[in-house]
Amino acid sequence: MAKIKIDGVEIDIAPEATLLQAAEAAGAEVPRFCFHERLSVAGNCRMCLVEVKGGPPKPQASCAMAVRDLRPGPNGEPPEVFTKSPMVKKAREGVMEFLLINHPLDCPICDQGGECDLQDQAMAYGVDSTRYKENKRAVEDKYIGPLVKTIMTRCIQCTRCVRFTAEVAGTGDMGLISRGEDVEITTYLETAMASELQGNVVDLCPVGALTSKPYEFTARPWELSKTESIDIMDALGSSIRVDTRGKEVLRILPRINEAVNEEWISDKTRHVVDGLKSQRLDRPYVRVAGKLKPASWGEAFAAIAAKVKTTTGPKIGFIAGDLTSVEELHALKLLAASLGSPHIDARVDGTKLHPANGRASYLFNATIEGIDQADAIVIVGSNPRREAPVLNARIRKRWLKSKVPVAVIGEQMNLTYDHAYLGAGGQTLSALARGEIAFAETLKAAKNPLIILGQGALVGADGAAVLSLAAKLAASLTVTEGWNALAILHTGASRVGGLDLGFVPGEGGLDVAGQTKAGALDVIFNHSADEIAIEPGAFVVYIGTHGDQGAHRADVILPGAAYTEKSGTFVNTEGRVQMTNRAAFPPGDAREDWAVLRALSDVLGHRLPFGSLAELRRGLYEAVPHFAAIDQIAGGEAADIARLGQIGGAVSDAAFVSPIKDFYLTNPIARASKTMASCSGLASKPLSVAAE
């Protein structure tokens, strides 16, 4: 550690730390525009100038100078830096004056107003009048896609957006052209950005040059109520903030969570907001003479009860989709047990994961944060760029830092980092496990190898054998103590919670494929599973939020609450227990799903043993205690991996294909979003990758 004095406060800090970071550690506030902790240093805004005692007789850019670059005093005193001296104040005022020379007076009509770094710093270092008498420069706005609006006259050329697309997103969508006062930020030939993370440039932009196009002129930040929650558009559980005004969700922003999403979110997470308002189910419906007709809750429950009374438990099934919370799964499981039904399943894509194999058999055991320590990665049957863009960015970060070798088994993909393509399917994985492929030596030499196993490898008929083979490979590697190489990447937010709860078929029970076959069951309770096709014959009760495929097939519709309208527990792909918080209320007569199931159970004559969400959770925590530990990970046992590897089975030569065909349209909320539909239309174009 090195000693340094900041404004008279002596601190110990790593020698590689910048003066800006040292100042923050000492409690000093240093303004900046171009510097960002997760991007490379550019040093081009000069707003972070400080005075260095004994250094050059001019202010220094604190973001670009490290503590180790400073000389100690003549008697060995620690180097001294001043952040509030007259020299510093005058220098920053000069920089601010130059920045404002060409900046338009757009604050009253700028969407960044109230959240603008330039506004805040102009208050501290700006002047009330300008000495500049020449004409201001104007820059033509650029089209860069349906998500990001540009008003480039406001741009101060901090290059945060350029560095983000090149370094984090890995697409190199944006760049800087021309020189001097003619410099401009643009995309190549003014085409739409291709990254699934492009919305993050809006958060990074310190001025109003890049703003959210769908949110344009919608609200001011001081009008909004802010609720901390999590995202359920994929299985990562990114930390988000939901901003509402009245009953309406207006925008979703990221929250910092170093262990999960750092401070990035995907474009689907951010811009699915309009889907929360469109095509909503706001009242119960009952199918009469082949047509769905609006009904009261009593009429809907009566129709269900009448049908259930004509059959028995073994002819009733329960299916839960990817947006179902743990509380709802628990209520569904209790209702199924009370009716005598063994037919329950939450694995709507047909994955062969099962809780009987132990928790380690279906978790991302190394954890998301553990990717930062991985020294060899093989991706099997997954396209992380489509399935979990934020996790993909983390893999890229690790690859950029250490050039960690990455290999892929499955479909050929356009990822954002260099990788070796080993083959298409299970036979390639088998050859890798036998050591017949050169990359096997790379895995053996690694101390923290990572085998990312996607659902594309597990949904086939040989899915169980593929899982066993991957576990056998993971167990054969010599790894650092405490490291588990097997990492299951899920695509649904409710999948791990369902497996933890044992929401899988009981003895003699049917899985999703079996339940949906014609004539298999008389009644199916479908909770938000809109990606399945239920064949004719069964009476379908759909509990969900949108008029999607599930509602179209239903005989009775019971409207529920979306993830922004209820408090619910979810478990992400690494096994971290998380919770959504209510930011708004369901529309019309829609109700929270647990309350719907509780009321329905009364009418069916099988009252569920809870009368409130708190009571439901008490029973849930008794059944599965680790659900009570919010933001904690209950890890799996390494011995489970060894046992799983011994199961074996025949692996076919079928190719692994990612279950996500269209990143933007994976669930009913996204499919109801016009913004996501626009993005989906553009996504058919080839993806771009940064040139390294």
Over which residues does each language-model region extend?
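N-terminal single-stranded DNA-binding subdomain of primase/primase-helicase replication proteins
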Residues: C45-V67
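Non-catalytic alpha/beta scaffold blocks inside enzyme catalytic domains
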Residues: V348-G635, L687-E692
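N-terminal export/assembly segments and adjacent metallocofactor-ligating motifs
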Residues: M1-E16, E24, R32, H36, ...
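Long, low-complexity segments enriched in small/aliphatic residues
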Residues: R617-E692
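Intrinsically disordered, low-complexity coil segments
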Residues: V67-F82, S476-W483
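Short, basic and Ser/Thr-rich N-terminal targeting/leader segments
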Residues: V41-R46, L236-S238
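Short, glycine-/polar-rich solvent-exposed loops and beta-turns at beta-strand/coil boundaries
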Residues: F35-N44, A66, R179
